Amino acid sequence: MSSEDLSAPGPSAPDSSWSSTGPSTKFELERETELRLEVEGTDPVRVELVSGLAEVFGTELTRNKKYTFPPGSRAAIFTWHGCTVQLWGSPDMAYVSRDTPMLLYLNTQVGLEQMRVQAEREGERGPRVLVAGPSDVGKSTLCRLLLNYAVRRGRRPTLVELDVGQGSVSVPGTMGALCVERPADVEEGFSAQAPLVYHFGSTTPGTNIKLYNKLTSRLAHVFNLRCDSNRRASVSGCLINTCGWVKGSGYQALIHAASAFEVDVVLVLDQERLYNDLLRDLPHFVRTLLLPKSGGASERSKECRRESRDQRVREYFYGPRGSLYPHAFEIKFSEVRVYKVGAPTIPDSCLPLGMSQEDNQLKLVPVTPGRDMAHHLLSVVPLDGGSAEEGIEERSVAGFIVITGVDTERQTLTLLSPAPRPLPKCVLLIMDIRFMDLK
C-alpha cells in the first residue's frame, strides 16, 4: 500500500437519497436578497431552485435539482436577479433578508480580478489575499465566495487554511493548502483530491505558537515554489483563511502570515480596531480593507464547534454522505513509532544550557502506547529516507488514523484507517483531538 492510499477511504456504497417529505415552503426572492437557513436538530432540510438564478456562497444552483443541508448546516441562497425556491423540512431558521453585503463582496472580487489581469499582462504575480477577523464573522465563507468567483472567471487560485480549529482543507488540527480548480460543491464544499496538509496537533494556535508560525512559513515557501513553476497558479494568487485569535500572540501570528506570504491585500471582517492595527503595522503597499460581516453570521457555542469538528473527522473517514467504508485492523505496539510535537513547559532553570522554551516547542517527544491513546487522532507522516526524527514536524502528512482500542495485555492497537493494512513506512504524530467512532 502506498502512503497516498491513506487520503482516500475505501469503496463507496450507493447514495441513499432522502425523500422530499415533511412540510414544504415556497420562497419568492427579489433581486439582491438571500434566503438564510440554519439547520439544527436531527433532520436535514432540502432545497430546490424552481425558477430564476441563485447561488450559495458563489456556487450557482442548478434549477430543479434538490440540495440537502444536514443538521448543523448554515447557508444563504442569494439571487442577483430574483428567483423562486422550494424548501422541504423544518429548519430552525429560514427567512429572506435584503440586508446583505454581497455587493461589497462582489466589488472586492472585481478588484482582485483586475489585479490578476494586470499580473497577466505585465508578467507579475497575482493577488495574495489574507482574510482576518475575530471568530464567527464569516471568514471561511468569504474565502469560499471569492474562490468560487475566481474559478468561474477561469482562474486557479489556492486556498491556504491557517485556521487549525476548523480544517476546511483537511481535518481539524492541521494547516494546509489546496489548489481550487472548480467551484465548491453546494453540499460537500471544495474537492480535496490532492491537498497539501501539515500536522499541528491542536485546535488552538496558542498551544504551540512556535510550531504554528513555522508551519505558516513552510506553507508560504511551498506556495512560492509552486508559483515559480506554474504561471497560472502565480497569476491566480491565493486566499488565506486565518483563525479568530486576533490579540497578543494571535495578532503577531497574523503579521507573520502576512509577511511570510508577502500579501498584497488584507480583508478585515467586522472589527475596526483590528483593521486600524493592521493598517498601522503592515507595509504601506498592502491594501487593507474593512468589510462588514453578513447578517447571517452568528456566534457558535463551544458545543456547536465541537460537533462541527467531529463532523469534519467523520467525513474524512466515512465521506460527506456516509457512503465510504474505512478499515479497522490491529497492529502491535512494536510496529509503530508515535511522537508528540512539543515537550511540556518546564522551568528555564531546568533546561539544558543554551536551550530556550521555544526550542522545546519543536522537540519530538516519543509517546509510549497505552490506554490514554484511545480515540486520539494521529497524523501519518511517511518516511522517505533519513532518520525518523529529522524535520518530521515540517513534512506533509499522507493521511490520518484513529486509535479505537488499546489492548495492553496483547500489546496491540486497533486502528480506524481509510486504507487497508499495512500502514506505510511512517511516523505517527498524535493530536490532542479525540474522535469517538460511533458509526
From Swiss-Prot:
Region (Disordered): 1-29
Catalyzed reactions per annotation: a 5'-end dephospho-2'-deoxyribonucleoside-DNA + ATP = a 5'-end 5'-phospho-2'-deoxyribonucleoside-DNA + ADP + H(+); a 5'-end dephospho-ribonucleoside-RNA + ATP = a 5'-end 5'-phospho-ribonucleoside-RNA + ADP + H(+)
Residues noted as binding ATP in the record, renumbered to the chain: 34, 74, 136-141
Highest taxon of the lineage: Eukaryota
Bias (Polar residues): 14-24
Localisation: Nucleus
GO molecular function, a single term: ATP-dependent polydeoxyribonucleotide 5'-hydroxyl-kinase activity
A Gene Ontology term for the protein's cellular component: mRNA cleavage factor complex
SUPFAM superfamilies: P-loop containing nucleoside triphosphate hydrolases (SSF52540)
General function of this protein: Polynucleotide kinase that can phosphorylate the 5'-hydroxyl groups of double-stranded RNA (dsRNA), single-stranded RNA (ssRNA), double stranded DNA (dsDNA) and double-stranded DNA:RNA hybrids. dsRNA is phosphorylated more efficiently than dsDNA, and the RNA component of a DNA:RNA hybrid is phosphorylated more efficiently than the DNA component. Plays a role in both tRNA splicing and mRNA 3'-end formation.
Subunit and interaction comment: Component of the tRNA splicing endonuclease complex. Component of pre-mRNA cleavage complex II (CF-II).
UniProt-recorded name of the protein: Polyribonucleotide 5'-hydroxyl-kinase Clp1
